[in-house]
Amino acid sequence: MDPANPNKPKLNILGVGVVKSDGVRKGTILDMEEFKKNLDESLTEAENMAGQQFPHVGICLSGTGIQIHHNKGMIAIPSNEVTQEDVNRVLDMAQNGITLTNQTVLKIIPESFSVDLEHHVKSPVGMSAKKLEVNAYIFTIPTTALNNVRKGFKDVGIDVVDVFPSLLTSPEAVLSRRQKELGVVCIDIGSSCTGVTVFEEGVMRHASIIPVGGEYVTSDIALGVRVSVDVAEKLKTDYVDLTFCDQSKPKDEEIALSRIDKKETETVSKLYLSQIAQARYKEILSLVNTELKRLGRDGMLPEGAVFVGGGSKARNLIDLAKSELRLPCTIGFP
């Protein structure tokens, strides 16, 4: 679904391809050849499952390189009736005043329109007006980073027809219209960052990127236990319980690291792992709460928080989040 046009019909999933990403870190391509290899492998998996080829794709990007700007645009309406062309013009005007040096605009998403003295208008097309204003979110990405992504796809024979920030695609995949109307925050815990998107009255009210994600938990475990990142990732996935250390009398156990890597001879306690991971997740949730406080919405969203992303798979994240955010919390599913 196009987040800028939610009235388009939903799509069906025909094929899925998942491979380990070795050429990208924090949303930036560090090894073009590895990136292209990963693309080719994942695309082949998806095409084999679907039984057809996909020469054209739309992609979503995440990472700390994406910037979010909030700005206004205003135009005169010569015909005294707002058309779709007028809406497009005023959205383009919203870019004025924003420094776009070495940046490319990915998407412009309207928050609300004003038609003369009428404010908080959702869809102004067809309304009588002499002046049209918009409050809009402008999503940008470093031009070089975008060009490298496009080149990688082109080199494996794929035409990129559209690019979306994952801050827009994740909520569209998991949130209902009712949730967006009543008030909800979508929290996308990725590897290098966490996306926060707030909706009320059916429109996006806030979007931000927190530069902390799941790989920080892995790094903390690697340092705390003195193991490799690969072993730490396996410990995080298989043994971490985010509320284990909060139990009144946790039944601790020693985990033999040789279960993961035969070269390892030490053990680590499940309680210690829980303490390491919980500290970092509490930091992420605290930073999310800071964003909600800026809106005056901390503990004040009726539909609560919906979690997505690889980092949301942590065991008992929902219980921890309910305590830290003081909101109803769930895992989001398409």
What residue ranges belong to the model's regions?
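Short glycine/serine/threonine-rich phosphate/pyrophosphate-binding segments
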Residues: 171-172, 192-197, 314-315
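Glycine-rich phosphate-binding loop of actin/hexokinase-like ATP-binding domains
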Residues: 182-224
